[in-house]
C-alpha cells in the first residue's frame, strides 16, 4: 500500500478540492488533525471494515462525495490496514478486524439540528455502498454512531472476543457503571 502519485492525481482531478491533505501521515500528524474540529459540532460517522476496495465501489464513493448533497462537511475516510494492526496474534487484543484491508467510514459533520436528517442520511448512504464488501458486518467501534445496533458492535469484535469482553464486563463492571460508550452489557 503506499503513496501512489497516479491515484492521488486522479483524486485531485476528479473531485472538487476544498482542502488537500492527501498523502502519507505519521501517527502523530494524524492525531493532531482532531484539533481542527471545534467543540459543538454534530457528528455522524458510520462505516465498515473491508476485505478489499474494488474499482466500482470506489467510483460510487467518488460520485457520492461529488454529489455534495450532505450539509456541512462530508468526508469519506479510507484507512488502509497495514503493519501491526494486521499482525497481532489472533485473540491477542479486543480489535477483531485483523483480516481487513480497509476501514471505510463516512464522516458527516454539521452545525444545525435542522440538518440532522440530511447529514445522517448521507452517511448511511455511504455505509450502504460499502456494506456488500464488509468483512464482518461491523465497523470501527470508536467511530460508531450513537444509534449503532448491538449486532454491528458485536460483529466488530467477533464472537470469541465478544465472549471475552462480556466476561471482563461481568467481573469488573457488573453494575454497568461504564455504560456511556457503545455498551457491552454485563448480563
Describe the predicted segments one by one:
Residues 1-187:
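Soluble FAD-dependent oxygen oxidases
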Amino acid at each position: 500500500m503506499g503513496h501512489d502519485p497516479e491515484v492521488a492525481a486522479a483524486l485531485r482531478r476528479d473531485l472538487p478540492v476544498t482542502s488537500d491533505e492527501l498523502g502519507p501521515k505519521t501517527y502523530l500528524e494524524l492525531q493532531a488533525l482532531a484539533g481542527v474540529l471545534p467543540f459543538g459540532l454534530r457528528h455522524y460517522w458510520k462505516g465498515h471494515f473491508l476485505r478489499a476496495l474494488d474499482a466500482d465501489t470506489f467510483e460510487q464513493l467518488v460520485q457520492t462525495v461529488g454529489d455534495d448533497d450532505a450539509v456541512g462537511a462530508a468526508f469519506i475516510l479510507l484507512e488502509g490496514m497495514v503493519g501491526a494492526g494486521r499482525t497481532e496474534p489472533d485473540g491477542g487484543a479486543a480489535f477483531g478486524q485483523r483480516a481487513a484491508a480497509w476501514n471505510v467510514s463516512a464522516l458527516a459533520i454539521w452545525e444545525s439540528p435542522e440538518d440532522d436528517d440530511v447529514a445522517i442520511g448521507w452517511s448511511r448512504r455511504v455505509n450502504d455502498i460499502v456494506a456488500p464488501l464488509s468483512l464482518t458486518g461491523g465497523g470501527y467501534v470508536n467511530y460508531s454512531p450513537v444509534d449503532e445496533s448491538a449486532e454491528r458492535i458485536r460483529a466488530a469484535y467477533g464472537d470469541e472476543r465478544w465472549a471475552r469482553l462480556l466476561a471482563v464486563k461481568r467481573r469488573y463492571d457488573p453494575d454497568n457503571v461504564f455504560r456511556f460508550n457503545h455498551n457491552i452489557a454485563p448480563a
